[in-house]
């Protein structure tokens, strides 16, 4: 599902509350790209799982993965890389509940910090820790 950016905080907060209650994980991948937004945002949602939520913003695409830990997020990132096969310069910031934040703001901030670091790395860089 593709959502609008204003819904991002609400949906992340909802997923965190659910994960906390059932003692599960939630991961967020922030995907940065150098492709024009309209083109990327029209293609990228086709790559994500039906159960994931995608929010396209000026910062990139936030992919929220319920019941997915950090290693599961890395598997998804490999799928994204294979789909684009080097045709798009992708970089990734990953954050997971409960390890990287307990609120929507904390999780989103962690993903943004990590994407910022990934942007200074090579094409396809993935940053999972601060």
Where are these regions (language model features)?
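Residue-level recognition of strand-loop junctions within catalytic nucleotide-signaling folds
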Residues: 34, 64-68, 97-98
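Catalytic/regulatory signature loops of cyclic-dinucleotide turnover enzymes
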Residues: 20, 85-91, 109-130
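Conserved helix-loop-beta segment at the catalytic/binding core of cyclic-nucleotide signaling proteins
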Residues: 14-21, 40-73, 82-87
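A structural signal for short, well-ordered beta-strand segments
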Residues: 61, 92-94
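Catalytic-site or vestigial catalytic-site microsegments of nucleotide-handling domains
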Residues: 6-13, 17, 21-38, 46
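Conserved catalytic/ATP-binding subdomain
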Residues: 6, 71, 102-105
């Amino acid at each position: 599902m593709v959502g609008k950016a204003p819904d991002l905080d609400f949906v992340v907060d909802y997923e965190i509350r659910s994960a906390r209650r059932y003692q599960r994980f939630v991961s967020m991948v922030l995907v940065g790209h150098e492709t024009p937004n309209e083109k990327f945002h029209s293609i990228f949602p086709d790559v994500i799982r039906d159960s994931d939520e995608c929010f396209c913003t000026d910062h990139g695409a936030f992919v929220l993965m319920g019941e997915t830990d950090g290693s599961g997020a890395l598997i998804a990132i490999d799928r994204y890389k294979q789909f684009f096969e080097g045709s798009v310069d992708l970089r990734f910031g990953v954050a997971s509940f409960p390890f990287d934040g307990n609120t929507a703001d904390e999780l989103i901030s962690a993903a943004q910090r990590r994407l910022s670091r990934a942007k200074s790395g090579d094409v396809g860089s993935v940053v999972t820790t601060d």
